[in-house]
């Protein structure tokens, strides 16, 4: 139905898993390889969407949240959010960050059709860029190999990037030129290296900028990367619940004892007086 077969190449930033000793897909699509399936899924009606929003808003409000952040919106989602907030008195605010794609229109064109002003409690805050996948999914991009490689991979496997550095750098330059806030998904330390290198170039080109980009997840941020982050006004947002849900697996499977002991280095960020935030990435884990 999706047209994925033995001849279909891996897309940039994704992987089509294959059967052993064969090019025949085994049904598992990683990262950007999932996009073709997502486009084929049936879409709920506006009434169904609004009913879901009502439940989510009340659940989050009961937990004390007064602002919701959508970290990977698109134009259709944003129009839905605008309509929802215009249709009723929503007791929370929402900020959406639009996921931008490097191979489509220039960034200014992608952002031109939506205001960043607050409308009925909803606004577009900036853009979201994905640099890698997830460590527990073996798609986070690490500088050193995974402790135990996944099936079909050798001991050198480190995950892979969503974007090559030159494409990220192009997006960063456009964002800095137009003063557009940035959230950048970075689980693995190799992805964080690429982000830091790109931010150095952008800060050199636009030394008077006031942007404070955010490294989302920042699971494996190293000590040297914390130092660089402070100098570049990069704010890590740590997904600290990883320790509760996957701590033993990070230690025994994904990262090994040394790297797992340094996951989500909040204390080291504190020592440096580095501004950081924490999040739970709902619905990956519960918002409470």
Where are each of the predicted segments found?
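Glycine-enriched alpha-helix->loop->beta-strand junction motifs that scaffold or abut catalytic
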Residues: 200-202, 229-237, 272-274
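A post-motif C-terminal structural segment
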Residues: 254, 266-270
């Amino acid at each position: 139905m999706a047209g994925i077969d033995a001849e279909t190449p891996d897309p940039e930033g994704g992987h089509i898993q294959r059967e052993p000793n064969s090019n025949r897909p085994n049904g598992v699509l990683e990262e950007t390889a999932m996009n073709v399936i997502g486009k084929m899924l049936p879409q709920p009606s506006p009434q169904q969407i609004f009913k879901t929003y009502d439940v989510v808003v009340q659940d989050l409000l009961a937990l004390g949240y007064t602002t919701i952040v959508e970290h990977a919106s698109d134009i259709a989602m944003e129009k839905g959010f605008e309509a929802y907030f215009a249709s009723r008195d929503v007791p929370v605010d929402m900020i959406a960050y639009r996921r931008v794609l490097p191979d489509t229109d220039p960034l200014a064109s992608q952002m031109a059709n939506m205001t960043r002003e607050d409308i009925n409690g909803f606004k577009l805050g900036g853009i979201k860029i994905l640099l890698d996948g997830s460590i527990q999914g073996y798609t986070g991009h690490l500088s050193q190999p995974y402790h135990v490689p996944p099936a079909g991979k050798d001991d050198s496997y480190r995950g892979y990037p969503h974007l090559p550095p030159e494409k990220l750098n192009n997006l960063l330059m456009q964002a800095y030129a137009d003063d557009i806030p940035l959230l950048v998904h970075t689980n693995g330390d190799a992805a964080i290296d690429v982000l830091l290198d790109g931010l150095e170039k952008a800060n050199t080109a636009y030394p008077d900028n006031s942007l404070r980009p955010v490294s989302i997840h920042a699971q494996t941020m190293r000590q040297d990367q914390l130092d660089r982050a402070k100098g570049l006004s990069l704010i890590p947002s740590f997904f600290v619940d990883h320790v509760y849900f996957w701590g033993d697996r990070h230690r025994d499977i994904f990262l090994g004892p040394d790297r797992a002991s340094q996951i989500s280095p909040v204390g080291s960020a504190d020592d440096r007086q580095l501004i950081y935030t924490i999040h739970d990435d709902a619905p990956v884990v519960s918002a409470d």
